[in-house]
Design a protein with these regions (language model features):
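Gly/Trp-centered helix-boundary motif
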Residues: 1-63, 67, 203, 216, ...
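Generic hydrophobic transmembrane alpha-helix motif, especially the helices
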Residues: 30, 34, 51, 57, ...
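Alpha-helical membrane-interface segments at transmembrane helix boundaries
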Residues: 38-53, 81-92, 185, 189, ...
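Transmembrane alpha-helices
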Residues: 49-65, 158, 177-209
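Non-cytoplasmic
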Residues: 97-102, 106, 110, 138, ...
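Transmembrane helix boundary and interhelical loop/hinge segments in multi-pass membrane proteins
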Residues: 156-165
Length: 238
């Protein structure tokens, strides 16, 4: 499902209620169907794929921004570090769910216009298929969710920059960028991998929560959050 396998016997949005009412035999619905006759198992597969795409993309965004920001802050120290960490403190104080709601609401019309004006462009086709609200989510992740990664990388850089091999690299005339790229970040790989992996379920939960509220992935596409919302409606009905 996460890789977009398309071996299912029918589409995720095909309505089959009329065929069932006419007595036609259809492929067995293992999880049953929703009120529109759409197969729940297939929609669950697509929902998992959408959630995994969002989780992995958010983790990559957090990885790039957090590692870059944290390494610069930790390496240069002094006033640079103080200013950059106060920015992190401000971002930490922001209510992330509210910011995501505002960004998703504000970006929706602009993304729709972008899709209309750039037909055929791969990003336009992606957001046309996956829904315009995803752009707002990705922007929110880029603005808010990298701060934890940056703090972890900064702390590791503060320790590593005192090592002898960093002093030797400076003595040989290596630039700050080269020292960070070739000597410091590779030695933070353990922390980077662990933090990135922890970011994936956090992003999936955030997307599911937003879709549950109705401001995430839009119909006819589905996600785990929107499916939970539909299921809650069914539980309340019956």
């Amino acid at each position: 499902a996460a890789l977009g396998i398309r071996s299912h016997p029918f589409g995720y949005s095909n309505e089959e209620l009329q065929r069932i009412a006419d007595g036609e035999k259809v492929f067995p619905h293992v999880f049953g169907t929703d009120r529109y006759g759409r197969d729940i198992m297939v929609r669950t597969m697509f929902a998992t794929r959408v959630s995994m795409i969002i989780g992995l993309t958010a983790a990559l965004i957090v990885l790039v921004i957090g590692a870059l920001y944290g390494s610069i802050s930790g390496f240069f120290g002094g006033t640079v570090d103080v200013v950059m960490q106060r920015i992190v403190d401000v971002i930490y104080s922001l209510p992330d769910v509210l910011i995501i709601l505002l960004i998703a609401t504000a970006m929706g019309p602009h993304v729709t216009q972008f899709i209309t004006d750039h037909q055929g462009f791969f990003l336009a086709e992606f957001f046309k298929k996956e829904g315009p609200n995803l752009m707002g989510m990705f922007i929110a992740f880029a603005c808010l969710y990298w701060v934890g990664m940056s703090r972890i990388i900064r702390g590791q850089i503060l320790t590593l920059k005192k090592q002898e091999y960093v002093t030797a690299a400076r003595a040989l005339g290596a630039s700050s960028g080269r020292i960070i790229k070739r000597h410091l970040l590779p030695n933070c790989i353990g922390q980077i991998v662990a933090t990135t992996c922890l970011q994936i379920p956090s992003a999936i939960f955030t997307e599911s929560f937003m879709s549950f509220l109705g401001v995430g992935v839009l119909a006819p596409l589905t996600s785990l959050g929107s499916m939970c919302s539909d299921a809650l409606g069914g539980i309340s009905t019956y």
